From Swiss-Prot:
The gene is fusA. GTP binds at residues 17-24, 81-85, 135-138. The keyword Lipoprotein does not apply. Coiled coil: none annotated. GO terms for biological process: ribosome disassembly. GO terms for molecular function: GTP binding; GTPase activity; translation elongation factor activity. It comes from the Bacteria. This is Elongation factor G. Keywords: Cytoplasm, Elongation factor, GTP-binding, Nucleotide-binding, Protein biosynthesis. Catalyzes the GTP-dependent ribosomal translocation step during translation elongation. During this step, the ribosome changes from the pre-translocational (PRE) to the post-translocational (POST) state as the newly formed A-site-bound peptidyl-tRNA and P-site-bound deacylated tRNA move to the P and E sites, respectively. Catalyzes the coordinated movement of the two tRNA molecules, the mRNA and conformational changes in the ribosome. CDD domains: EF-G (cd01886), EFG_III (cd16262), EFG_mtEFG1_IV (cd01434), EFG_mtEFG_C (cd03713), EFG_mtEFG_II (cd04088). The keyword Zinc-finger does not apply.
Length: 692
């Protein structure tokens, strides 16, 4: 099977947005206009083409990034649909990792919202070029220029319109193209009948003004264009397009488009934007990796003749074919039925079948090429973030970093039959989602599941019921507290047992000190002259790491500390790894009295949108939840309150906000950072955990 589309004509893009900005509808329309769907499904009716898990259809939100392939003007566009709800940021992270470009969808009434900030930040981390689509121009309160202003004010993005809307709200009837300097008028409901027209008289001055602003902004990033502009020469549309493309691909500039996906306006022009301005796999730097045995850094060029290298970015259990592993090919080609090496796990895998995914049907293909995104059936050991590569040319591509869970609940099966199935279900769900964890509490014997938020865990429990037929009772949510040290101290840990038979002897002196918040645990070996032999040093580190899982105050994990092993002693016969492990854990326990341990709690960044009349009540409520109001602003006829609130105080907030605002308020929250728990509250938590 020969390559159908050249690498230059391939686009791997994601569509990212805040919940409800209309992302799924935009994706649907893209699939409709590229001829992949014959009838359009609406998200509010629960029939959307991309949202194919049952819960997604019920809740009208996108949970799993389905990868779909579409074609437009001789180009292949692979689309990864990403969720907009904060509890699913891991899905966004993992899809951004394998994208070359993205469309950020904004709601024309709200502009940039909290989750937009989160996904924008993630995309910046991965260096993903973006174009912006201001959607819902037909909605009451739609304001294109306000939305562009929020890109500058909240994201500090160098974003400029390449289009202007003709009219807004129910008067929205067309789009002005500032590059071509023409306009498009829509004649029918499905948006297929478009007429290219002159720019209407009353919009001409505005179009000239914004075209000049666009040229100025792009010329600042392009010397040749700047010279022409300063000398007053005419800049052709081809030159302008090329300069916008270059600046967009280097992530210095973000073109802004407008439209209404729901009303079928602006989607084809947005597709032109994807082809014109977003990069192909050859436009971006080749991916870097390391050779497993030598740790040498190598690059893998986007080239069919290079050795095969791919990254698995999603694992799913499919009711018909079993385990599906979605992967992005960075270099080389792969035939179905062949063997590859999972270099991350050092396991050989056989690629059974290769499927190209459409939103809800799949096409079996015999070969994939550099730049392709596909799904493999039959991989046994591969999980999210693993590298698959040619057996003779091993490489490990940079893997993904996932945030730690912030919320836990206890879960117990309703019957004995459920018990056995629950273990399997939890294992499969953990394979699919690295931010979901399940473990057994050693003291109570309960199964504890942890995730990124209440909705995340709701959906996990829901999936256990639907997909794995496991009925379970769920306890009240628990906050993932942490512990850390405030002071430095030198502490001794000694473990000596000499009573009959072989003795045990381990003795260490460790200096503990606070580390920067978020830096984690750092261990330093400062032993001089072999007072603790080299072979026992790893045991000291392992002993500390194990003991840190159960902190000294209330049994929560200890984070953000440094430990320097600087002295100790050993016994020729009685010393062992185990003895030094125990000595290190005793040192950590002894640090409790000297290092001033404190509890830390997750602080959430909360944004509440409410009608003005409820402002006083909501501000009071936030303060009563130990929240700090960070700022407020008017958005249309609503007020937006931004605050930092401890997660412990946010349980059940959705219900309380509904009753305080008669259902007219909405809120979003994202984990922001950990900070110290006030002493009076910490004392209560410690008491409760010690069962006093």
């Amino acid at each position: 099977m020969a390559r159908e589309f050249s690498l230059e004509n391939t686009r791997n893009i994601g569509i990212m947005a805040h919940i409800d900005a209309g992302k799924t509808t935009t994706t649907e329309r893209i699939l409709f206009y590229t001829g992949r769907i014959h009838k359009i499904g609406e998200t509010h009716e629960g029939a959307s083409q991309m949202d194919w898990m049952e819960q997604e259809q019920e809740r009208g939100i996108t949970i799993t990034s389905a990868a779909t392939t579409a074609q437009w003007k001789g180009h292949r566009i692979n689309i990864i649909d990403t969720p907009g709800h904060v509890d699913f940021t891991v899905e966004v992270e993992r899809s951004l990792r394998v994208l070359d470009g993205a469309i950020t969808v904004l709601d024309a009434q709200s502009g940039v919202e909290p989750q937009t900030e989160t996904v924008w930040r993630q995309a910046t981390t991965y260096g993903v070029p973006r174009i912006v689509f201001v959607n819902k121009m037909d909605k009451i309160g739609a304001d294109f220029l306000y939305s562009v202003k929020t890109l500058h004010d909240r994201l500090h993005a160098n974003a400029h319109p390449v289009q202007l809307p003709i009219g807004a709200e129910d008067q929205f009837s067309g789009i002005i193209d500032l590059v071509e300097m023409c306009a498009y008028h829509y004649h029918d409901e499905l948006g297929k009948n478009i007429e290219r027209i002159e720019i209407p008289e009353d919009y001409r001055d505005m179009a000239e003004e914004y075209r000049n602003k666009l040229i100025e902004a792009v010329a600042e990033l392009d010397e040749e264009l700047m010279m022409k502009y300063l000398e007053g020469e005419e800049i052709t549309k081809e030159e302008l397009k090329a300069a916008i493309r270059k600046a967009t691909i280097s992530v210095e500039f973000f073109p802004v488009f407008c439209g209404s996906a729901f009303k079928n306006k602006g989607v084809q022009l947005l597709l032109d934007g994807v082809v014109d301005y977003l990069p192909s796999p050859v436009d971006i730097p080749p991916i870097k990796g390391i050779v497993p045995d030598t740790e040498e850094e190598v690059v893998r060029e986007a080239d069919d003749d290079a050795p095969f290298a791919a990254l698995a970015f999603k694992v799913m259990t499919d009711p018909y074919v079993g385990k599906l592993t979605f992967f992005r090919v960075y270099s080389g080609t792969l035939d179905s039925g062949s063997y590859v090496m999972n270099s991350t796990k050092r396991k050989r895998e056989r690629i059974g079948r290769i499927l190209q995914m459409h939103a809800n049907h799949r096409q079996e293909i015999s070969k994939v090429y550099a730049g392709d995104i596909a799904a493999a059936v039959g991989l046994k050991d591969t999980t999210t973030g693993d590298t698959l590569c040619d057996e003779k040319n091993l490489v490990i591509l940079e893997s993904m970093q996932f945030p730690e869970p912030v919320i836990s609940v206890a879960i117990e099966p309703k019957s004995k039959a459920d018990q056995d199935k629950m273990g399997q279900a939890l294992q499969k769900l953990q394979e699919e989602d690295p931010t979901f964890r399940a473990h057994t509490d050693p003291e109570t014997g309960q199964t504890i599941i942890s995730g990124m938020g209440e909705l995340h865990l709701d959906i996990i429990v829901d999936r256990m019921r639907r997909e794995f037929k496991v009925e379970a009772n769920v306890g009240a949510p628990q906050v993932a507290y942490r512990e850390t040290f405030r002071k430095s101290a030198q502490v001794e840990g000694k473990f000596i047992r000499q009573s009959g038979g072989r003795g045990q002897y381990g003795h260490v002196w460790i200096e503990f000190s606070p580390n920067e918040r978020g830096k984690g645990f750092e261990f330093e070996n400062a032993i001089v002259g072999g007072v603790v032999p080299k072979e026992y040093v790893p045991a000291v580190q392992a002993g500390l790491e194990e003991a840190m899982q159960n902190g000294v105050l209330a049994g929560y994990p200890v984070v953000d500390i440094k430990a320097k092993l600087f002295d100790g002693s050993y016994h020729d016969v009685d010393s062992s790894e185990m003895a030094f492990k125990i000595a290190a854990s005793l040192a950590l326990k002894n640090a409790a009295t000297k290092c001033d341990p404190v509890l830390l709690e997750p602080i959430m960044k909360v944004e509440v949108v409410i009608p003005e009349e409820y402002l006083g009540d909501i501000m009071g409520d936030i303060t009563s939840r130990r929240g700090r109001v960070e700022g407020m602003e008017a958005r249309g006829n609503a007020q937006v309150v931004r605050a930092m609130v401890p997660l412990a105080e946010m349980f059940g907030y959705a219900t309380s906000l509904r009753s305080n605002t008669q259902g007219r308020g909405t809120f979003t929250m994202v984990f922001d950072h950990y900070e110290e728990v006030p002493k009076n509250i910490a004392d209560e938590i410690i008491k409760k955990n010690k069962g006093e």
